[in-house]
Amino acid sequence: MPQLLPDDVIWIHDYHLIPLAAELRAMGCTNRIGFFLHIPLPPPLILAAIPAHDWLMRALFAYDLVGFQSEADLTHFTRYIQSEAHAEDLGQGRWRAFSRTLTAGAFPIGIDVEEFAGLTAAPEGRDMYQRMRDEYSRRKLLVGVDRLDYSKGLPQRLRAFRELLQRYPENNNSATLIQIASPSRETVHAYGDILRERESLCGSINRAFGDLDWMPVRYMHRTVARKKLPGLYRAGRVALVTPLRDGMNLVAKEFLVAQDPA
């Protein structure tokens, strides 16, 4: 720990690193350490079914401040530590268990509205909007922007779009789904399986319903520059945000900000 100064504050992010504070404490670190969980926390009954759940919760008490994305997640945490660790409520978000005291709170995140609105009005945003409008002037655009992750519900979204085309054929040739799936954890084998499943679904939909001048699903497995995203959002009639389980999804907020106020 030679890089640490006595008054440094350490901020740890996400579940992969829950044990880090306990390891630092074992090495003699006395700095203030905070932790923020970027995923939903399960209810106590489900949490208690996780192997070594008590070890994980004990590790969280090595932090001084623990943050969650929502009040529901915070409630799950406090209910768990009360029932499983007999934590003492000290008031004002402070809890004592495992011979340590921490502060727990909910800190929902948002977006910088002015900054994103500025991107919408910037040349790159306007150019992307115009390109989309020119290319898809005859069709309604549905837009999805996600990381390639099993929690985002992408197969279910694609199947729902296929169901729309099957049940309401009048929408054929009049609606296009643009789905961006940014690469994520490509070295993990399971994520390669996810990618192949998505590509297979998109291919089957396009083969079943596509025409010479219409591709129902335009699927892009790449990252789109942030400066261009507002133009894509603004061109869309509908944004599809369909996670199976998610934290604070910012796509819905960005989509609203990107719309033309007129």
Write out the residue ranges for each language-model feature.
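Catalytic cores of carbohydrate-active enzymes across secretory and cytosolic contexts
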Residues: M1-A262
